[in-house]
Regions:
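Radical SAM enzyme core and accessory elements
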Residues: 123, 135-149
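Residues at the C-termini of beta-strands that transition into short coil/loop
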Residues: 23-24, 132-134
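Short proline/glycine- and acidic-rich turn/helix-capping motifs at secondary-structure junctions
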Residues: 99-104, 133-140
Length: 149
């Protein structure tokens, strides 16, 4: 989910039997809004409150999906904000390698940035995985829909 707070709370109240994964991509409000304009309607503070409620009711760890882009969310301040955002409840972060497309607005972050994220998150006690892409050499990776001529 991208995180509609009232629906996260409703799912917690309904005692749903699945795990929650949130597409976060930034724990800095202005950056997240640039990536996901949806954030203007449902700011991070409201999302965090709903996630705290989710954890309080379900005791289930929260998973965050987090694509790291070059020049957008690949700096030290970004990982520090993510650590702070995650600390209120047990969580897992899936760092996702971006699959570039021709003429795309986003660029894949350097592997060094992904490894820094992973190290810093793990040092903070947050379970972290890096999801590396396969198939991007033939435009068949997740998120790629390309038509090369």
């Amino acid at each position: 989910t991208s995180g509609i707070p009232k629906l996260i709370k409703k799912m917690a109240d309904d005692e749903v039997k699945f795990k929650l994964a949130v597409s976060l991509h930034s724990a800095i409000g202005s950056v997240r809004t640039g990536i996901m304009p949806f954030n203007e309607q449902f700011p991070l503070e409201e999302l965090r409150e709903a996630l705290a409620y989710w954890y309080q009711k379900t005791k289930n760890r929260i998973t965050y999906e987090y694509v790291v882009w070059k020049g957008i969310n690949d700096q030290k301040k970004d990982v520090e904000a993510l650590i702070k955002f995650c600390k209120f409840a047990p969580s897992k972060v899936n760092l996702i390698e971006y699959n570039p497309i021709d003429d795309g607005l986003f660029e894949q972050a350097d592997e060094k940035a992904l490894l820094l994220y992973k190290r810093k998150l793990e040092e903070a006690g947050i379970t972290t995985t890096i999801r590396y892409s396969r198939g991007k050499d033939i435009d068949a990776a997740c998120g790629q829909l390309a038509n090369k001529q």
